[in-house]
Every structure is written in C-alpha cells, then in structure tokens.
Curated annotation (Swiss-Prot):
SMART domains named among the record's database cross-references: BRLZ (SM00338)
Record's subunit section: Homodimer.
Protein name: Basic leucine zipper 8
Signal sequence range: none
Family named by the database record: Belongs to the bZIP family.
Organism whose genome encodes this protein: Arabidopsis thaliana (Mouse-ear cress)
Disulfide links within the chain: none
One of the Pfam families matching this protein, by short name: bZIP_1
Compositional bias (Basic and acidic residues): 37-47
GO cellular component: nucleus
GO molecular function, one term: protein homodimerization activity
Record lineage: Eukaryota, Viridiplantae, Streptophyta, Embryophyta, Tracheophyta
PANTHER family: BASIC LEUCINE ZIPPER 43-RELATED, BASIC LEUCINE ZIPPER 8
InterPro entries the UniProt entry points to: AtbZIP8/43, bZIP, bZIP_plant_GBF1, bZIP_sf
This protein's encoding gene: BZIP8
C-alpha cells in the first residue's frame, strides 16, 4: 500500500503528520463557514477599520507635532540670527573703542616723552624728586 491514492505514509503515521497532509491538501476556502467565523470576520474587519482610523489620526497628530516643532526651530533661528547680528555690531563698536584708546595712549606717551625731554633740556631735572620721576615711568 505504499502508493495509495491519498499519498499517505505506509508506515504508522502519527496524527500530526496526517493533519499536516490534510491541511496541505484542502484549501481553507473549501471549508464551510460557520456563523462564528462570519461574526469573527466582521469583528476582525471592524477592528481593522478602527485601527486604520486610529493610525491615520496618530499620523495626523505626528505631522502636526512635527510642523509645530519646525515652526519653533525657525523662530529660534530668526532670534539667533538677530542676536548674532547684534553681537557682531557690539564687537565692532568695542574694537573701534579699543583702537581709539590705543591711539590716545600712543599720543599721551609721545606727549609725555616730549615733556620729559623739554624738562631735561631746560634743566629742571634737579627740581624733580625721585618719587615724581617714578610717576612718569612705565
């Protein structure tokens, strides 16, 4: 009986292998549908529909959050650009002031040097005390 019509194994098959052969041979569409199956299918369809609606709503909320986040980032970008511009302007003003102070300092040193030279030429060095002379030293 090795080659039976149903291609069943000839040696004592176990129930699981017989069931697997049956499942492989008989399409599920050929099985009769019961009322439980149809109500379960309706429930499954309703669950799928609710899940689809829920997923769409979740995706919409996610897009809205992303859009709000992008708007916040753009707002921050504008603020940071403005802050950067004001800092660059402030730095430029500070550099101008620094250059003016350096220039003024150089003028004062030259004036000090000329004054000391004139004092030396006039011979007033003898009237200056050592402490006063140290004031002019840098």
């Amino acid at each position: 009986m090795a080659g039976s019509v149903y291609n069943l194994p000839s040696q004592n098959p176990n129930p699981q292998s017989l069931f697997q052969i049956f499942v492989d041979r008989v399409p599920l569409s050929n099985l009769p549908a019961t009322s439980d199956d149809s109500s379960r299918t309706a429930e499954d369809n309703e669950r799928k529909r609710r899940r689809k609606v829920s997923n769409r709503e979740s995706a919409r909320r996610s897009r809205m959050r992303k859009q709000r986040h992008m708007e916040e980032l753009w707002s921050m970008l504008v603020q940071l650009i403005n802050k950067n511009k004001s800092l660059v302007d402030e730095l430029s003003q500070a550099r101008e002031c620094y250059e003016k102070v350096i220039e003024e300092n150089m003028k004062l040193r030259e004036e000090n040097s000329k004054s000391r030279k004139m004092i030396g030429e006039i011979g007033l060095n003898r009237f200056l005390s050592v402490e006063a002379d140290q004031i002019w030293t840098f």
